[in-house]
Amino acid sequence: SEVRVVNFTPEIANWSPAAFVERMISPLQPEHVLVGQNFRFGRHAVGTPQALSEIGCGRFEVHAMDLVAISGVTVSSTRAREVVAAGDVAEAAELLGRPFEVGGVVVMGDQRGRELGFPTANLVLPEGRAVPADGVYAGWLEPGSGPDAGRRLPSAISVGTNPTFDGVERRVETYVIDRDDLELYGVDVKVTFAERLRGQIKFDGIEPLISQMTDDVDAARQILA
């Protein structure tokens, strides 16, 4: 099998339905094309599954698949992005058929987590990347290399700007539970979200923050056990 990723550009958006078929689909020489019942293509989204079949002129067979609904809500990428943005990673997992995850290379942070007793692996994600709402989550970190490569390590994950320290850059900071020995700078990692624990809070000082972080880690440990 082969997967081809095509960047959706203004030029492609301006193609007519016929141009879309001739330039995007025909070169692949498919025998069957599977689309959703609500599939639309071509300029102003005027192309439909029926139009796709007509333009194909018998060169391939078009199958319009039934839409999937969960609790009466149609499963779609739009809906998945909405629940991720709201921090509902449990519903996101139900819609996606797998837990929501992000990935990237661990970068040097402010070292505050280490000073507080909770060293974190920090990811700065590109703008536009889907990220759960600011808050704290239970989940896993999986290193792509090193002694723990491929292992899912139970973690407490913070998403946000560190308002207690007047931070402005939005980050994903992951504390691997009971593993203060990890050296992850420069390592490509995958962070998987299991359950939301709470929203982001601005604390009045270090002690309340440490107390809450301790509670968060305990809660994450229990959820992931």
Where are each of the predicted segments found?
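Active-site donor-binding loop signature of nucleotide-sugar glycosyltransferases
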Residues: 8, 67, 159
